[in-house]
UniProtKB/Swiss-Prot annotation:
Expressed by the venom gland. One of its GO terms (cellular component) is extracellular region. It is found in: Secreted. One of its GO terms (molecular function) is toxin activity. The record marks Y37 as: Aromatic residue of the functional dyad. This is Potassium channel toxin alpha-KTx 2.2. The record marks K28 as: Basic residue of the functional dyad. Has the structural arrangement of an alpha-helix connected to a beta-sheet by disulfide bonds (CSalpha/beta). Keywords: Disulfide bond, Ion channel impairing toxin, Neurotoxin, Potassium channel impairing toxin, Secreted, Toxin, Voltage-gated potassium channel impairing toxin. Residues 37-39 are annotated as: Interaction with Kv1.3 channels. Disulfide bonds join C7-C29, C13-C34, C17-C36. Potent inhibitor of voltage-gated potassium channels such as Kv1.1/KCNA1 (IC(50)=0.144 nM), Kv1.2/KCNA2 (IC(50)=0.675 nM), Kv1.3/KCNA3 (IC(50)=0.23 nM) and Shaker (Kd=160 nM). Suppresses expression of the Kv1.3/KCNA3 channel in lipopolysaccharide (LPS)-stimulated mouse macrophages. Down-regulates secretion of nitric oxide (NO) and inflammatory cytokines, such as TNF-alpha/TNF, IL-1beta/IL1B and IL6, in LPS-stimulated mouse macrophages in a manner dependent on Kv1.3/KCNA3 channel blockage. Reduces activation of MAPK and NF-kappa-B signaling pathways in LPS-stimulated mouse macrophages. It comes from Centruroides margaritatus (Central American bark Scorpion). Belongs to the short scorpion toxin superfamily. Potassium channel inhibitor family. Alpha-KTx 02 subfamily.
Length: 39
Protein backbone atom coordinates (compact mmCIF):
# COMPACT_ATOMS: atom_id res chain seq x y z
CA UNK A 1 0.00 0.00 0.00
CA UNK A 2 1.49 3.34 -1.02
CA UNK A 3 0.81 6.10 1.46
CA UNK A 4 1.17 9.83 0.94
CA UNK A 5 4.39 10.22 2.92
CA UNK A 6 7.57 11.45 1.26
CA UNK A 7 10.78 9.60 2.01
CA UNK A 8 14.41 9.17 1.15
CA UNK A 9 14.90 5.99 3.18
CA UNK A 10 12.69 3.14 4.41
CA UNK A 11 13.33 4.13 8.03
CA UNK A 12 11.25 7.25 7.50
CA UNK A 13 8.32 5.08 6.43
CA UNK A 14 8.26 2.69 9.36
CA UNK A 15 6.57 5.00 11.90
CA UNK A 16 3.65 6.01 9.64
CA UNK A 17 3.26 2.45 8.37
CA UNK A 18 3.23 1.03 11.87
CA UNK A 19 0.73 3.69 12.92
CA UNK A 20 -1.61 2.77 10.08
CA UNK A 21 -1.09 -0.96 9.76
CA UNK A 22 0.17 -2.13 13.14
CA UNK A 23 3.51 -2.83 14.79
CA UNK A 24 4.44 -5.70 12.49
CA UNK A 25 4.07 -3.66 9.29
CA UNK A 26 7.02 -3.43 6.95
CA UNK A 27 7.98 -0.43 4.84
CA UNK A 28 9.90 0.53 1.73
CA UNK A 29 10.65 3.81 0.02
CA UNK A 30 9.63 3.73 -3.63
CA UNK A 31 9.97 6.68 -5.99
CA UNK A 32 10.10 9.08 -3.05
CA UNK A 33 6.94 7.75 -1.43
CA UNK A 34 6.40 5.26 1.34
CA UNK A 35 5.05 1.82 0.61
CA UNK A 36 3.68 -0.20 3.52
CA UNK A 37 3.46 -3.95 3.77
CA UNK A 38 0.82 -5.02 6.30
CA UNK A 39 1.47 -8.38 7.96
Amino acid sequence: TIINVKCTSPKQCLPPCKAQFGQSAGAKCMNGKCKCYPH
